[in-house]
């Protein structure tokens, strides 16, 4: 009976302890390092946040290309899927910052233009990744998600260009 009570108490502690640990890091994204999360948190404007998220996405995409060209001996599939998921997370977060900036009527024109430009570049890179190789089954589903997420972000950026008013033009006297 004492053993049963001990197991129940231990299980409850681990269950509730996990919730406390998660609550301690409210804004931490699992695909960002602590330094990257600090940079996002310290960014003063939405344009800066968009730029940071896109640079992190670019970094993940470069690492993915390297990993495809130089496969590691261990955990290759896990690494590819992790990089693809991190890339999609960065793109989605940049799109979220754009939507929030539009709702708050902030000046995010540069961020929108950068998003439209970069997502087109990223889509070209993603489409060049082979899907017919024997290893492609390991990451094919996440690659399709990445392509779809990038296309959606590109469409949203183009739509946001039309929504956001152009900057005022000064008249010369």
Model regions and ranges:
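Long, charged/polar, soluble alpha-helical segments
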Residues: 22-173
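Bacterial N-terminal signal peptides
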Residues: 6-17
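Positively charged n-region of N-terminal signal peptides that target proteins for export
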Residues: 1-5
């Amino acid at each position: 009976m004492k053993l049963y009570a001990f197991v129940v108490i231990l299980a409850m502690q681990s269950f509730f302890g996990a919730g406390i640990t998660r609550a301690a890091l409210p804004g931490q994204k699992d695909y960002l390092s602590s330094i990257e999360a600090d940079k996002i948190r310290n960014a003063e404007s939405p344009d800066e946040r968009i730029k940071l998220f896109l640079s992190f996405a670019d970094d993940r995409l470069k690492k993915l290309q390297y990993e495809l060209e130089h496969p590691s001996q261990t955990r290759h599939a896990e690494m590819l899927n992790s990089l693809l998921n991190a890339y999609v997370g960065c793109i989605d977060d940049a799109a979220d910052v754009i939507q929030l900036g539009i709702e708050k009527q902030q000046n995010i024109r540069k961020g929108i233009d950068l998003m439209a430009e970069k997502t087109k570049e990223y889509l070209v890179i993603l489409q060049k990744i082979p899907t017919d190789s024997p290893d492609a089954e390991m990451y094919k589903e996440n690659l399709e998600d990445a392509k779809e997420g990038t296309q959606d972000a590109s469409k949203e950026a183009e739509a946001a260009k039309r929504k956001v008013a152009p900057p005022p033009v000064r008249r010369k006297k």
